[in-house]
Amino acid sequence: MNAITFLGNSTMIPSQCILRAFTRISPSKYIRDTSFRSYPSRFSSCINQYRNADSDRIIRPTNAVPFCTDRQSSVTAQVVSEARSHSASTTCANDTTLDQIYTKNGLNVKPLVVERLKRDEKDEEAVNEDEEGVKRDGFEGVKCNDVEEEAWRLLRDSIVTYCDSPVGTVAAKDPTDTTPSNYDQVFIRDFVPSALAFLLKGESEIVRNFLLHTLQLQSWEKTVDCYSPGQGLMPASFKVRTLPLEEDKFEEVLDPDFGEAAIGRVAPVDSGLWWIILLRAYGKITGDYSLQERIDVQTGIKMIANLCLADGFDMFPTLLVTDGSCMIDRRMGIHGHPLEIQALFYSALRSSREMITVNDSSKNIIKTISNRLSALSFHIRENYWVDKNKINEIYRYKTEEYSMDATNKFNIYPEQVSPWLMDWVPESPDSGFLIGNLQPAHMDFRFFTLGNLWSIISSLGTPKQNQAILNLVEEKWDDLVGHMPLKICYPALESSEWHIITGSDPKNTPWSYHNGGSWPTLLWQFTLACIKMGRPELAEKAVTLAEKRLQADRWPEYYDTRDGKFIGKQSRLYQTWTIAGFLTSKQLLQNPEIASSLFWEEDLELLESCVCVLTKSGRKKCSRAAAKSQILI
């Protein structure tokens, strides 16, 4: 059972904000974590006096909603009884001088202490940080060219504010577009490159606010056809709406979308994974780890992890998802265990293991995460990897093998090896890639760029495999990059495959949109992977190629045709993550040392641990040694 401690009314010194606790809790839901969460109503609101720019505001803690007001008031606090042994803060992120609420020396301590924290210039100078608290080493003296200057102007124009504070960037802001659909919302996955661009620029406020507000939205009730998904689900996006009130007042509300309004009504599986990855990046770049140490943030991390690690019927350590649950958010035949989700899942688990505070209450989830990481890396490295030799082995597979020692474990039919793959895979044994999906009797041999890049970034693949992926990109540059980096997948589904797999989707026609379209936003992830593997020249080549066209083409969302020559037929212009991806790539190339904050090196400890239960029973020998033998240090 969840236990909460109500510490009576404590007068704020001084206070100009009201925290109103919600008591609307879903009786049918509970949290396995020991931290307390409530279920607020549909909107988070901030009431301002009309035209009053000086109205005070506060970001509510987990169970409260902010109301901007001019009156002094008291705060009723709810504190988790399972607090860590050292103080943890719940911070008012929107105030220029921050209110910090904390408990002293552990749990169940009274009275609640409220202090006003003011900025200390001496402390900032001591850690060599700017006024936002972001490390700036390596960026001084860097001048922007005309393309970068326009990109920064457009990125800043896309900023969304809530209670006069920045909370994200819209997906696209084309001044000529009269029907923005949902492109005027803040998407979690779309905001990641924007967040990194701001962090690398030394501007952390917008990222901190974004992380806290989306965390608060995590706890809201979400229902589709009278059914609620598991706790911990992050929204795909949110929109700031302004509602009129009486007496010349207005109310700003956050309206999230958990998939209820999405095309196909698909839950955004990747949103929570991206949120955890961004939270780690915030701490690594700014050096401010207090955010991830907060009780509410720790609870948010655990809720996402618990949702992903929940027991089910699956026999594999990979995450089972439906079609359209990630960047490829339309029907494209990726249901099952798509590589993109597995790579982000692995990255999020590694981030969680770094950030979760170690204590008695967290040791079980940390152990579960470590075991899953070990099993997941082994499974992907062994079963998703293909090169010329592996494809030849699959081509000669025997089928219908019923035994514990079967070579063709997934009963893959050799006829699935398409002629295009035999012609396309390089001759060199130093080139290869991770396939897009693996299920019983099914291998998706398409090359999915985001999944392969994140396998490099997170070290999901072995060092040898990671180098081989970049070798393949270099050898197949015309196919995967062409006139505009980078193909989201290769090759495109055509003819009967397009009809059957996409359902004749008019937006995903061959070599368009998600079906083989070219997406400039993938540039920053390609840059990060290249820097990690010591191949920055590949990234520079791609960035230079994109820089020649993006400004003239008005920063499109994607490009069409086999070589990415034409702007996509339904592509939005002034797409924010296209702009932000370009800026982030430029900054990473200007200061490659900072890239180490965003990727992971090989974790040898994961390779040493084996969770193979069959080994203990003696039914089968563990093949962990095979995975370890692939590693090149």
From Swiss-Prot:
Protein name per the record: Probable alkaline/neutral invertase A, chloroplastic
Intracellular or extracellular location(s): Plastid, Chloroplast
List of residues that carry Phosphoserine: S623
Tissue expression from the record: Expressed in flowers.
Family indicated by similarity: Belongs to the glycosyl hydrolase 100 family.
Location of the transit peptide in the chain: 1-71
Pfam families the UniProt entry points to: Glyco_hydro_100
InterPro entries: 6-hairpin_glycosidase_sf, 6hp_glycosidase-like_sf, Glyco_hydro_100
Family annotation (SUPFAM superfamilies): Six-hairpin glycosidases (SSF48208)
Keyword Hydrolase in annotation: yes
Principal location class: plastid
Keyword flag Nucleotide-binding: no
Any GO CC annotation of this UniProt entry: mitochondrion
GO MF, one example: beta-fructofuranosidase activity
Catalytic activity, reaction form: Hydrolysis of terminal non-reducing beta-D-fructofuranoside residues in beta-D-fructofuranosides
Function: Chloroplastic invertase that cleaves sucrose into glucose and fructose and may participate in the carbon flux between the cytosol and plastids in leaves.
Gene: INVH
Keywords, ordered alphabetically: Carbohydrate metabolism, Chloroplast, Glycosidase, Hydrolase, Phosphoprotein, Plastid, Transit peptide
